[in-house]
Amino acid sequence: MMIFRKNIVGKYLSEWRVQSNNLGLSDREIFIFITLSFLSTATEVFGLGMFLPIFQFIRFKGDVDELVANSDVWQYIIDGFSYFNIAPSLLVLLLIAFGLFLARQFFTYTRLIYDTIISQRLIQLQRNRIFDGYIDANTSYHDRTPVGSVMNIILTEVNGAIVSIMLPMSMLVYVIMFSGYFSVLILLSWEMTIFSIVAFLIASMIPKSWINKSGTVGRKLVNANTLVSEFLVGRLKLPRLVRLSGTEDTEKSEFHKLTLRQRKNYISGAILKSKTETLMEPVVIGLSLVFLYFSYTMLQLQVEMIGLYLVIIMRLMPIVKSILLQIQSIKGLLGSSEMLKESLRVIEGSKEKNNGVKLISQLNREIALKHVDYHYEGRKVNVLQKNTKY
C-alpha cells in the first residue's frame, strides 16, 4: 500500500514538473522557491525549539550543571556558547530566539514576493501565448471557436491554471514546516509523536470526500464561466438587434439563468472548503486535550515539555489544515488547468501555414505602398504605422 502511494506521488510530481516547464516555470525557479521555503521553516522551527531550553533555564534558575544533568540538549548548547566565548544567560537565549523569528520573517517575505513575481510572469506568458496563437490560427479554428471562450480563458482560467501550478510548491512549504515541527516532537517524546500521528490521520480522513467533490464543482464552474463569456460577447456586440427583435426579456432571462448557475457553483465550492477548514480543528483539539490529561496523570511528563507540545500542536493544526486546503484547491482548479492545456494544444495545432509566399528575385518596376493605415474604433493609434508587411 505504501509503495503504491509512493508511486502515485512520484508520478504526480513528475507530471507536475513537465507541465510546469511547459508553462514556463524553470527548474531554477522551483529550486529557489524550495530553498527559501526551507530556510524560513528551519529558522521558525529552531526559534520555537529555543523555548524548551529557555523554560528549562528558568526552572533550574540558570544552574548549568543541573541543566546538563537533566537534558542532553544542554550539552550541545554549552558547547555552542563556549565556541563563541559567550556565557549562558536568559537574555542571550531570548535574543537568539527573537533573531531566529526575525530571520524567518525575512525569508517568508522574500518567498512571498518571489511567488508573486513568478505567478504574474507565468500568467502574462500564457495570455500572450493564447492571443498570439489565436491571431496566427487558421480560419477554420476561428470559425469553430467562440470568441467568448477565448476571452474566458485569457481573463479567468489562465489565473486559475497558474495558481494550480504554483500550489504544489506552496504545499511543499507546509510539508517542510510539518516535517520540521514533527522532528521537534520526536525529540520531545515518542509518545507525543505517535499520538500526534494518530490525531492528524483521523482529522485528515474527515474531508476526503469533500476534497474529491471539489474537482467536479471546479469543472462545472469553468463551464459556467465559459457560457457567461460566450453569451456576453454575442449579445453586447449587437444590443440594437436584441431591441429590434423584441427579445429583451428572453435574453435577460437566459443571462440570469447563467449567472445563477455560476453563483451556485461558486457557493458549492466555498461550502466544501469551509467544511474542510472548520471541522478538522475540533477533532485535533479534543484529542490533544485527552492526551494532555494522560500525559500529566500517567506519563508524568515535565510541565515545560507539555507546554511546548501544546504550542507545537497549535502550530501544526493550521499547517495540516493548509495542506488539505491546498490539495482541495488543486482539485478545484483542475478544470482551469485542463482547459488551458487543451486550448494551447488546439491553438498550436491550428497555426496557419503560409504556403502562398513566393520570393521575388528582382523587380523591373518599383512597388510603393503609401498612406496605408488602420485605426480601431475609438483609438487614434495607427496600428499599421510600424508594419512593413502588407
Language-model segments: residues:
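Cytoplasmic juxtamembrane "membrane-exit" helices immediately C-terminal to transmembrane segments
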Residues: I113-R121, L125, L187, M205-L227, ...
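Juxtamembrane loop-to-helix connectors within ABC transporter transmembrane domains
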Residues: N22, D115, I135-Y181, K237, ...
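Cytosolic ends of transmembrane helices, especially the final helix of ABC transmembrane type-1 domains
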Residues: R240-R243, T247, I271, L316-S343
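A hydrophobic transmembrane-helix motif
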Residues: A103, M169-I211, I267-I313, I367
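Membrane-integrated ABC transporters
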Residues: M1-G49, R59-A97, A103, T110-D115, ...
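Primarily ABC-family ATPase nucleotide-binding module
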Residues: L344-Y390
